[in-house]
């Protein structure tokens, strides 16, 4: 548990420090669940936090599916959150692009859920066809569940031949599962960047736009202004959850086991 102004404090369990907070931002993978399995004790901790009047908001880096899919996944594990209590980096991408529309068409990659739509923006679900890549004016990478070297090479060659805006809805490098780590978009993008492709525009933790939206949502859920010093980000990853929270001025809580 990181006090921004008092150093680091180690606590045996999250429930031991609940009295320090009026609101908690909760990462999903590694905090609430690991793959299809729930983290032991988290249901009881969530229940105690709610009993203490703490406002809860799941803030997850996930672009392949929308926030409703995450809600349903958590519900099947016994964790109940309302639609408003979950913000995904995919949702952040949808909101940002609604207000900052690139000149279309926008090529969509890695979508596993409902259609990704932005009002008044022509979105095309790309296939492994280089001519489709070359016809769009910008790209949005949602996830890498089915990513392979063909997708990687097509994106590289298309951007290398004709640089265009690239938006990425998940800044994770890896995600924890029960017996493995899945490779996430930032890993693949790091290889493109090392080969000279321009930096993408990232949505999700550790970047501030998702925390801006989270603060607005916390105010809506709680019905009051909660100081940053009373809001904690609970995560298991230093370079997304903890870095993002500390940079934004929140307290950060690193879950280590």
PLM ranges: what are they?
Residues 1-257:
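HAD-like aspartate-dependent phosphatase fold
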């Amino acid at each position: 548990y990181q006090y921004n102004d008092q150093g680091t404090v180690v606590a045996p369990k999250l429930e031991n420090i609940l009295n320090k907070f009026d609101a908690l931002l909760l990462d999903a993978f590694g905090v609430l669940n690991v793959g299809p399995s729930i983290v032991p004790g988290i249901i009881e901790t969530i229940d105690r936090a709610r009993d203490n009047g703490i406002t809860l908001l799941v803030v997850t880096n996930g672009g392949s599916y929308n926030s409703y899919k995450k809600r349903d996944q958590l519900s099947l594990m016994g964790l109940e959150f309302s639609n408003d209590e979950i913000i995904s980096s995919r949702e952040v991408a949808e909101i940002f692009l609604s207000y900052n529309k690139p000149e279309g068409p926008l090529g969509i990659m890695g979508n596993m859920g409902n259609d990704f739509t932005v009002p008044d923006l022509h979105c095309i679900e790309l296939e492994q066809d280089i001519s489709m890549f070359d016809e769009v004016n910008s790209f949005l990478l949602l996830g890498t569940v089915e990513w392979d070297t063909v997708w990687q090479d097509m994106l590289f060659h298309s951007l290398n031949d004709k640089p265009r805006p690239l938006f990425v809805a998940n800044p994770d490098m890896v995600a924890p599962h029960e017996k493995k780590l899945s490779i996430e978009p930032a890993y693949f993008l790091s290889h493109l960047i090392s080969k000279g492709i321009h930096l993408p525009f990232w949505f999700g933790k550790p970047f501030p736009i998702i925390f801006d939206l989270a603060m607005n949502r916390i105010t809506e859920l709680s019905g009051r202004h909660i100081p940053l010093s009373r809001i904690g980000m609970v995560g298991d990853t230093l370079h997304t959850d903890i870095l993002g929270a500390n940079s934004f001025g929140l307290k950060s809580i690193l879950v280590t086991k």
